[in-house]
């Protein structure tokens, strides 16, 4: 069952299969989800690794300027960060417990703060009141006279007053102590608030340059960090959950945790990601936190705080602690100083009343000073000494005098004496120290200062030197570090890309394997089902074929090819065809998985009988239909019985035995109402067999039409001629021409109540496929009795408009005529079968699965072919197709010989081919595949890319045919450096006018006359130096012999009169010839030209050997001796001298100048002698006239004066033959010899035509390109081969005349044809040689072209030559064509081996032994 039916629950009993399928799909989906989760974890880990890499770079950059201690500090910071991270992980593990503890601790702190606030307020009020009272007492003490005591006491008294007595344990704390304690408590109670205020002050100091918006964003960031509840070290207040910043109730109530709504968490995370949009804030804060991962299994949100922010907060904390410590010390010192002042004021106040109220005591000097209390211990290093050591730090002070008593009882006088003695001793010691040690210490201090400054200078220079070294080293380190960092980034990027690519490939491979496995399983199930369906449909078709074959006896015509399996099949004779057709078993309603073979066979037999009954009923219905009343009611061919058909009498020819059998087969098909395909090999008379069946219907059953014949345009006239020739009684309507002509012709069938009898306006209408498409609306209105489609491969595409229009015609029977039912693929055979039996062959996909794939793969790769399947295919095709081949039915027609002539590219062709190949080197394999896989269809369904490839293939084929298809050689000539003169009006002149040489060189040279007269002429004509004259003129072969002075000098030696020699030297050459001809009796007419060429040793002197004029009486003798060997001799030996004259006796210039010019014009000023002599030497009027035709006036004058009768001087080209070939002008015409040798095919064709012409063969040459035909016509004209041409541009009437001329005129040597235009339906049996200059995509087109000569009426051996270029596109095309031909042979003839085609390499030696037609 299909996947769609399985999922939609359309099949019954498929629950288990559906559950298994869904279970497999769920497992695959779970595996895909698991892979996706692993991929997400991998991406998170890669992101963390990249962050760590950035942090390492930041640390490395920051550590460049660190010292050893700072590096240690950084290392300790890293360790503390690691400890914090471990603590954070521990916090993540026990988060719920820690959060509960933090909340409880926070609540307790809030309660304690609320309890301490009233006490703190009271303490502040008391301290404020005490401060007010102290200030009041101090003002009073200042007003009292305490100066004597201060003067007496001096510095020691002040120092003693600064020391306060210390109470014993258990005693009440003095007021000063209580005040200090209160201050300390106050400080301790407000410590956290002070820290918070100091932190806020620090932040304000740092952000005083920032905007208010950035400060608000920072505060929001800190609040959000506190909301997320980040925990760090327990001692780190900045990161502890109980941070100093107070939380509002709203914050606590709206705080998010991991159990909050996912939408709120996402919104908060989005807020955190969108913070600090300004670049300045981002640079300062770096980042607040990064959400690493949300673990849905443990419901936790992992957050990471960057180390840079951690260091900033730790530094702030250290600074705040230092500030608090300094403030506490300053407050303590201030409190102690304030307390000492308060004690002194109290002591002074007590002593003053005692002196006023107790005079007895003041008068007595025996007042003792007792020890009042233990002195207060001093702090050492900030720690108070223990109570166990009551040692006094200072001596006791007498409260009355304020002098020290040193623990003894003494009077005030004694105390003052001791004080004076102490002061004297103290001053003496200081004086001695100042006198003795001050100078020494001063020198020592100066020396130490100088040494220190020197050391400072040395240290600074060393430091500067080391700093410079470090700076240079640091630059190199930075550069190396950057290089290493870039390399590391590249390597890391390439590594991860490689891993990602490998993982993607693995993932895709796994998915592809899973899909392939599922597809394979589905294909196995579908193949089993299709096998049963195939067996059902084949059985149905074979039974149908059996029913029809029993009626039309196809086995008797083609031989017994029945399938042996039908003998063991159930008895089909039991099926009664007379019963009405039962319900048809539709294929899609049959369950091929559950039905057994017997039931399937029964249903197939039922379907076959139904199809046959429907076909017969359609034929009966057509015969029973009438356009109006009883029209065509006389047609009832099915009532005739089975009889043996004889040749119709109205057929004006004698059918051969196999043609008569074909007539019987066609008649039986008509009786059964079945359409057929007459697929006899080309040349066996398909046309006459189809005409004979029309004649049979007209003669036997009085059915005279209407018949329609559809044929290609090239065979329209041939059909008209054949029908008129074989059945003269038929009236033919040729339906083609322009629109007006066709409109007139349609009147023949637009009449109502028209009966088609012998007297009907027409019986057979002949038209083309183009007319069918254009006038389909008119032709479909007619009810055609019989339709004949000639060359039915024209409807090989079921998608074409031809096929659709013809299928919609109302026809009783259809007959397809084709010699090649299969041209490119099995699809074309299916299109023809579907056209004749649409109900039986309705699915091309099934037909392709059954037969096409197996047969086409066998042809391409030579795989094993299923013979049983091939026999079943033949059994199916047998009722509808009749095919005979020539060698089986006609023994007098021999096999044709096919020869592939392989040529090598010429140098120019190879260069062009390589250039084209280099331009498409990337897709050259695709182009070759296109060349080998192209079917050559004309459907026009190729895509844009396919059309581009085919255009490129066509360019390669042009190179193989001839390079001139790209660019023709042109006439070349040098630059003409000249100026042309202009003549006056010639209206006043006679019939002949002498025109001087008008071209002149633009460069002219003016020669002074003095130089010409005195230097040139005397030296040339003077005979003073006889020796020089003789040596340089007489004895030199290059000296002129017409010097009058020299002749007069030598006349005495020669024995001739000087006047005679002078007269001869000054006469013109024509005059001398006339005189010689008229007055010399020794010269005969036949010896005139022997005098010119000096071949005859006559009695004439050397002076008489000049140019003579021929006479009409001796014209033939003159022509005989005009050329070297004689014209007549050359005409009698043309073949022998052809190669010598054309190839060996031709001289061509090796160099052609780039520019040409006449000689430079020389003018002698004041003299015309030089100009006259020059013009007479170069442009003698008599000589120039002698080179052309002599005017009648001159002939008359010469005849009257000299009695010389002549017509004209001979044509110049006859003097002599090699001259016109040995010398040529600078104007170069394209060489035909080079034109021939630059194409390998044309070169071999030239050699082959010479041999074929010698053997009196007649040749058909087929082309694919009309431009190539133009080039070949030039070649044939050059070789003077008589030829005619037919291509697609030829008109219909011209085609008929060309074919008639070829068949009747034997002097035509070559017939040039286009393969598409001249390869269908025409008879060219006068030719015995076929040459394919370039092959068609479709091998069937070439086969049809061959059969124009190899067909009935051919009495000679037919030889086919195919010119191919080795190692190119053409060779690939030829291999593909052989595969297509093999498919045709397998299907139509049952052959499994290819035809034997000879392949010959066309080098010089092998082509000589090339077999020629007999």
UniProtKB/Swiss-Prot annotation:
Biased composition (Low complexity): 154-173, 350-361
Record domain Helicase C-terminal: where: 1244-1398
Biological process per Gene Ontology, one example term: regulation of TOR signaling
Signal peptide: none
Keyword Nucleotide-binding assigned: yes
List of residues binding ATP: 681-687
Oxidoreductase keyword on record: no
Region of interest called Disordered, as start-end residue ranges on this chain: 106-252, 330-396
Enzyme class: hydrolase
Bias type Basic residues, positions: 129-142
Assembly notes: Component of the INO80 chromatin-remodeling complex.
Family statement: Belongs to the SNF2/RAD54 helicase family.
The protein's name: Chromatin-remodeling ATPase INO80
This protein's encoding gene: INO80
